[in-house]
Amino acid sequence: MSSLHNLHNPTPGKDSVIHIGALLPDIMSTYGDDGNALVLRERLRRRGYQAEIIRITLQDDVPSSCDIYTMGGGEDVAQILASKHLRTHRGLFTAVEAGRPLLAICAGLQMLGEWFQVADGSHAEGVGLLDVTTVPQATRSIGELVGTPLTEGLAEPFLTEPLMGFENHMGATVLGPDARPLSRVKYGVGNSIPAGSSIPATGLVDAVSYTHLTLPT
């Protein structure tokens, strides 16, 4: 894996290196979610692209120059630390505003929102990239998840096939007026808002509910 040294910002192409920014894998990878960056790198390489993973830890500033970002989940304390770090080092905000995609898995979703409820019942401040809030469910949701893509309003409907994966979460996420759904749950629990709940996505911030694995179809 690459370090932050000599990081540049190429136009992605097969003759340039695509930099995958793995956000805070030192504290936000409780379930091995940093493996998403590994899978993404491998899939790019198999298609003839050069790709490197940039590990961005709590000791690093957050660069705005990566081509794509990934983030996993963690416990309450880790989420609070990560949220503060991303609010302080605002490279991710710059990158997202420039249209760089971000894949947030597990608790990475609730952390990107306005606030999320922690174990003692208090509200922890989120990063503020998504207009969502998260509270605990009565019971944990575990099992297969299938979602139907919602492409209305997207400049390029890049999703045409169902999203399939595995969900494992306690959180129930409510979308605010500025959050747009990526898909509607066909099978499974999803956000555990009423039946047919939505998976939020704003622009190219792909916060795929709490799905740990999204399967290509």
Q: What kind of region is each of these model predictions?
A:
Residues 21-31, 60-63, 116-124, 159-169:
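Short low-complexity stretches enriched in small and charged residues
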Residues 120-208:
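Pocket-forming structural segment of enzyme catalytic cores
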Residues 21, 54, 70, 103, ...:
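Hydrophobic/aromatic beta-strand patches that form the interior of the parallel beta-sheet core
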Residues 76-153, 160:
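Cysteine-nucleophile active-site neighborhood
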Residues 211-217:
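Conserved small/polar residues in nucleotide/adenosyl-binding loops
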